[in-house]
């Protein structure tokens, strides 16, 4: 709700017409024209980047970390191999994300299962950054993460859940760097039915950072040009093979494919909005979705088996109006 206010001069902050400022009202009540003091200048309404700042303040998203949290993140030591952490650095795990992705927090790998009783089946590994290795319950990093709940992404910036030494450092699965991870190894048959899974902590080294478009283009080219020696093509073939099996299982159980367009905001070099368009949906997107859904199913089954308390997200039966709308 908009309200007219008289802005008091500030001793150290100068502002002009069109500036966006955060204010504090000095009087009580609902007078037509209230008095207010400037607390902070966010930017000018002609600057499109100010929209992100308005949203940050409107939703009270924390942008600074405590000194204790920064100290913990800065002094983080890399994870080492031990009895509780397997060595996956010889496995060709890769990260697959959008071209504008800022964080690389999951990696995938697949190969044909060589066991005789699972002909044409697949072995899959899904690995995520082992954040729990660095963030301990109740420490300063944990407290800061609880304030945020998640990282928040804007077209021109990201407000990370953890200090950048972790979010863009030890917890980012960057290529050719050793990283602690939590992994699940899964075996499926040729119809995409899960036969087994096992969770473990590991040390991994991503072999490449691939975009969805690059993976799809590489796979499509490989399909046409058999015998390619391209490294990414060699990784793409088994990934798509496992995806095809999982997609078969999806169709068998009657899962719905509800395509909700995701918008992509493109900025120019000045940070101004240049274009807004639908993100293209490729099989490479669906591949990652199927792998992540499978990993989540494995996690849910493991927690259930161990009798650990867990919050499950269960979709309620849709109303008739929603079904009709669909």
Language model features: what each stretch is:
Residues 1-123, 132-177, 209, 216:
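Charge-lined substrate channels and their catalytic hotspots, especially those that engage the 3′ end
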Residues 53, 67-71, 86-89, 196-200, ...:
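Short coil/turn segments at secondary-structure boundaries
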Residues 100, 262-275:
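Active-site-adjacent bridging/hinge elements
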Residues 107-109, 185, 264-266:
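Short, surface-exposed charged micro-motifs
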Residues 113-115, 188-193, 267-271:
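Short acidic-glycine loop/turn motifs at beta-strand connectors
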Residues 121-135, 286-297:
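Conserved phosphate/anionic-ligand binding catalytic regions in large, soluble enzymes, centered on
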Residues 152-252:
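Conserved catalytic alpha/beta cores of large enzymes that bind or transform nucleotide phosphates
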Residues 270-326:
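Extended, well-ordered alpha-helical scaffold/bundle regions in very large, multi-domain proteins
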């Amino acid at each position: 709700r908009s309200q007219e206010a008289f802005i008091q001069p500030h001793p150290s902050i100068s502002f002009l017409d069109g500036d966006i400022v955060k204010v504090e009202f000095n009087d009580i009540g609902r007078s037509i024209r209230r008095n207010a003091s400037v607390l902070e200048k966010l930017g000018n309404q002609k600057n499109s980047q100010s929209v992100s700042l308005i949203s940050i303040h409107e939703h009270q998203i924390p942008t600074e970390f405590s000194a204790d949290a920064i100290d913990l993140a800065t002094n983080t030591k890399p994870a080492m191999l031990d009895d509780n952490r397997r060595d996956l650095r010889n496995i060709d795990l890769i990260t697959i994300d959008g071209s504008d992705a800022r964080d690389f927090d999951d990696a995938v790998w697949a190969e044909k299962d060589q066991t005789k009783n699972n002909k044409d089946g697949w072995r899959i590994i899904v690995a995520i950054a082992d954040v729990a290795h660095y963030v301990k319950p109740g420490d300063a990093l944990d407290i800061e993460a609880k304030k945020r709940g998640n990282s928040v992404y804007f077209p021109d910036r990201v407000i990370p859940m953890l200090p950048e030494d972790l979010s863009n450092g030890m917890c980012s699965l960057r290529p050719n760097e050793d990283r602690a991870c939590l992994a699940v190894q899964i075996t499926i048959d040729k119809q995409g039915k899960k036969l087994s899974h096992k969770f473990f902590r590991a040390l991994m080294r991503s072999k490449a950072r691939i975009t969805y478009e690059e993976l799809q283009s590489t796979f499509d080219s490989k399909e046409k040009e058999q015998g390619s020696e391209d490294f990414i093509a060699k990784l793409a073939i088994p990934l798509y093979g496992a995806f095809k099996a999982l997609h078969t299982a999806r169709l068998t159980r009657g899962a719905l494919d509800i395509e909700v367009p995701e918008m992509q905001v493109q900025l120019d070099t000045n940070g101004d909005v240049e274009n807004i368009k639908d993100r293209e949906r490729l099989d490479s997107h669906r591949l990652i979705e199927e792998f992540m859904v499978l990993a989540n199913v494995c996690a849910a089954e493991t927690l259930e088996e161990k009798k650990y308390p867990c919050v499950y997200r269960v979709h309620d039966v849709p109303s008739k109006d929603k079904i009709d709308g669909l």
